[in-house]
């Protein structure tokens, strides 16, 4: 930080170099998640709660493990029962999550998944008709596979399927 400040002409500095010490800046960065939340998190919570309050189940997609952890924590705070499927999820646990989600009498409201870990052999179309894309990696094959987790030709035409793409304006 100090190197950046010294690159500013002296007459424009006006004592700015004393605003934050290096340690203060490190502390702010370390505590960022405690003080700041992405705007999409608020929209995701609002949308998820609205759908779940109507008795719907929700499938949420994200491509980053840290983001999945943040979303899981934030939705759990809202009372949403959520499970996650990532590359770290063992096959047996994956099957248990899928079976519980597909069971209409279970209290599992949502699954959050990484497309690579949930791309094939997981059918959720009978229980879920709402897919929310928190972020994407723009891999076409993975995207098309993710769409089909809640939509099947010959199996889900009777129920409309809704996809939500959370994006920042002008992105």
Where are these regions (language model features)?
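Conserved Helicase C-terminal RecA-like lobe
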Residues: 1-118, 122-123
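SF2 helicase/translocase ATPase core recognition
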Residues: 109, 113-171
């Amino acid at each position: 930080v100090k190197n950046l400040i010294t690159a500013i002409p002296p007459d424009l500095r006006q004592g700015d170099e004393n605003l934050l010490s290096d340690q203060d800046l490190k502390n702010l960065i370390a505590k960022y998640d405690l003080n700041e939340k992405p705007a999409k998190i608020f929209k995701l919570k609002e949308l998820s709660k609205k759908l779940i309050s109507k008795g719907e189940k929700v499938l949420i997609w994200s491509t980053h493990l840290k983001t999945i952890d943040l979303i899981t924590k934030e939705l759990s705070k809202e009372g949403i029962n959520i499970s996650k499927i990532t590359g770290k999820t063992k096959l047996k646990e994956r099957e248990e999550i899928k079976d519980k989600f597909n069971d209409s009498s279970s209290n599992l409201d949502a699954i959050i998944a990484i497309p690579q870990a949930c791309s094939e052999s997981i059918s959720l179309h009978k229980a879920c008709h709402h897919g929310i894309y928190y972020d994407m990696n723009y891999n076409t094959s993975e995207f098309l596979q993710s769409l089909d987790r809640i939509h099947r030709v010959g199996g889900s035409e009777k129920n409309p399927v809704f996809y939500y793409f959370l994006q920042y304006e002008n992105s």
